[in-house]
C-alpha cells in the first residue's frame, strides 16, 4: 500500500507539537459533524468517525466535548466541504479536502499554495480517478495473524492487512470503517494507532531531490492552511 502511517503521524505531530492548530481543525470538524446530525457519537456515524480519528491525534477530551456542546447550542456557523485537485512538481498528484466558511478565501489560498510551490490547480476529477477511497485502521495490541483471524470471525472482507513496525494496519472499503472498529473493540482494543478515511494512490511516484524538496514544501503549505482538513498525494515520502 506504500503509506508509512506511523511516519506520517510522527511528522504531523512534530509539526503541531507546539501549536493548537491540530486541535482547532478537529474542533471545527467535530462541530460540523455534530451539526449535521445528532450531537451524540453513538447516534451519528460521521461524528463518531471524527471523534475516533481525533483520539489518534491525542486531541483532549475537553476539546471534543466543547465542540459538541457548541453544536448543541444555538450557534449556527455554516461550513462547506470542498475538494480541490491539482498537480505538484513533475506531474505529481494532489487532492486537498477543505472545510470552509468562506469559499472564495479558501479557493484563493489553495490556488496560491499550488502556484507558489511548483504546482497548479486542476479541474474536478483531474486526479481523483487515480486514488481509491479507503478506510485505514491500525492497532498495536495484536499480531497480523490475530487480526486476520478476527476479520474472518466477523465476516469482514477487507482489502489487506499489513504489519508496519509494531502496528498492524487494516485496509478496507470506507463503508466498513465502523464494522472493523467494532470488531476490534469486541476483541478488547480500546485505543487505535490509526483511524482514517483516506484517498490512497493507485500508484506512487518518486521525485528527484530538488523536486522532492519543493513538493514537501507544497504539502506543508497546504496542510498549514486553516481550512484544509486533509491532503492526499501520490509521492513516495
Swiss-Prot record:
GO terms for cellular component: cytosol. It comes from the Bacteria. GO terms for biological process: regulation of DNA-templated transcription. One of its GO terms (molecular function) is DNA binding. It is found in: Cytoplasm. Keywords: Cytoplasm, DNA-binding, Transcription, Transcription regulation. Gene3D superfamilies: 1.10.10.200, 3.30.70.980. Belongs to the TACO1 family. YeeN subfamily. This is Probable transcriptional regulatory protein EAT1b_0153. It comes from Exiguobacterium sp. (strain ATCC BAA-1283 / AT1b).
